[in-house]
Design a protein with these regions (language model features):
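N-terminal capping/interface segment
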Residues: 1-19
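Hydrophobic transmembrane alpha-helix bundles
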Residues: 4, 70-72, 175
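Structural signal for interior beta-strand "rungs" in well-ordered beta-sheet cores
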Residues: 15-82, 93-98, 105-165
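Core FKBP-type peptidyl-prolyl cis-trans isomerase
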Residues: 84-86
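C-terminal segments of enzyme domains that contribute to small-molecule binding surfaces
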Residues: 93, 100-130, 162-210
Length: 210
């Protein structure tokens, strides 16, 4: 379904459908993904939550469908990563005028980590930080104020600084079935008919959905 409204709840201006407030072509968001912010205007997600995301790098933030992103969650991109390969972490190439350097070499000031990819049905907790280049699998949960520096497998709960796995949400067989069903790709009407199954802990009910 094509979204036609920013706010999913009547009278609630703290939650937005994130896809409908994004203007940056290097940020891709799936349907029904929501962002909640009770401190700032949630429509300012690009400015307040996606940091060091400079066009010169071409790296992207890709967020899947039906994700829930809590207030203050941050996505830190490549330009925030000073190069650790050189003998100094100082970003000389950024100040090319001052040091009479070639502007085209500006990207050598940092280590390029690539795209940041968030799967479908991911819950990112309050003030969590997702570092550049991280891949988070479908159904994962990122704990409050966790700092995620490494990839997170599907349906895994992580927390802490740096974030470490706490446990899997389900056994491997159930996770495999969930990844096969991919309910988030169903049409709106099928989802409506099967919300009870989606909210249950019964994978068989989900597999048998019509």
């Amino acid at each position: 379904m094509e979204m036609k409204k920013i706010y999913p709840r009547t009278g609630d201006r703290q939650i937005v459908y994130l896809r409908d407030v994004i203007t940056n072509p290097n940020i891709e968001v799936g349907e029904y993904t929501i962002y909640n912010d009770f401190i700032h205007d949630p429509r300012d997600f690009e400015k307040n939550n996606v940091l060091y995301h400079y066009p010169i790098n071409g790296d992207k933030l890709k967020i899947g469908k039906f994700c829930s992103i809590a207030c203050g969650a941050k996505f830190l991109f490549t330009s925030g990563n000073h190069s650790m390969k050189s003998l100094s972490t100082y970003t000389f190439p950024i100040f090319f005028d001052e040091w009479e350097l070639d502007k085209k070499d500006i990207c050598t000031a940092w280590d390029n980590k690539g795209d940041t990819v968030i799967g479908n049905d991911v819950w990112i907790g309050y003030e969590a930080v997702i570092m550049s280049g991280v891949k988070i699998g479908d159904g994962a949960i990122i704990g409050t104020r966790a700092v995620v520096t490494k990839d997170v497998p599907p349906y895994t709960i992580v927390g802490g600084v740096p974030a470490k796995p706490i446990r899997k949400r389900f056994d491997d067989a159930t996770i495999e079935k969930l990844e096969s069903v991919c309910w988030w790709n169903w049409g709106e009407e099928k989802i409506k008919r099967n919300i009870a199954a989606i909210q249950s802990g019964d994978i068989t009910a989900l597999e048998n959905a019509d």
